[in-house]
């Protein structure tokens, strides 16, 4: 199985929500709650995106995440959480980072993930056709400019199974509340 | 002294998730009620994490709830502060260590004093979470306003809060029957994973009926009486407004309770601007979308 997104969250509910919305968006994900596992999963699975949800994390976990995020160059890193905590991630390498502050907004996360994945696909195709070395870093670097043109993902954003769809929302709630 | 002839209406404002805009709504709702000519006191009961004063633009206070908790004053009325706004008083929250775990006797003293306040509305700005200290203030309130945002974590916490509220209220009532079987049954029903046959309130009521029919009648009466209003905050689109329908369905099916009303508060930049200025939105930008939504809530409360 090719894992496109690795999620770290020590908050069971938030992590579950992230995994579920990405899964429904047909994105292969791996949810982890241990930073050491995240580190080894990134090197073994080579995901396109790593999502670090800082909510509920302890100070030492935040420090480890900060250290890990600054050392990652092979994939895009999305950092979620309280604005004050996210601020500590703002130094160093920012070209492959995206910061999304609370409240957790599945619609934005899905939209951004789709945008990033779509750009990576595009860039890989371009690199392959021009027969260049397809290292991930130049692919990622092109994502820096992704705000310049709207992606296809934006056009059908309403189709994303965000919490606005009552049936899906109710089904999600039942699942999380173990009412099924 | 002008005596307020009508009984005081205690309104609890709860945001089980935390960070959903509860305090901003409480502060501005109190002002809106006061502007409608109602005599209001806003009380910061976010014990241990109080900050309602900052939303009202009050930088320092002569008295706080600590003075009442520590018996420095005898009556709650003595620590009501002037807000500079007509018809509106304010009680600043306490921050003494351990206040979040208010002792039962202190809580009861506070509850008794709330009912004695000479106001049309006593607005309680309660803390996040579902601790019994929060739940009990909701139980003694005539109306409760549950603040949530459309995001799943907030909705989940709101449901969990309601479940705690329902079971707390039922446990209190069924204790009067001195029947341990009933209490054990309630405990089992809390854990729907282990006891799926009790996951719906109807299922539970039927089992109670077999044990004691008068207990089941009481349970039904209590459930009919739990009718919180839901405030859906930070709505960004028409679709966001639907989020409450899902939780309403779950409330009805699994907890046996209904919402009395769903109220909408739309995302509005004026809230952030007002907070930055430490001024209530109702004063800083009374014509804003947020202010209009708050006025709607005030109209709902005043009937």
Where are these regions (language model features)?
Chain B
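Walker A/P-loop phosphate-binding motif and the immediately C-terminal alpha-helix
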Residues: 3-46
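Conserved nucleotide-binding/hydrolysis micro-motifs of P-loop NTPases
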Residues: 47-49, 96-98, 129, 151-154, ...
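Intrinsically disordered, low-complexity acidic Ser/Thr-rich regulatory segments
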Residues: 201-245, 254
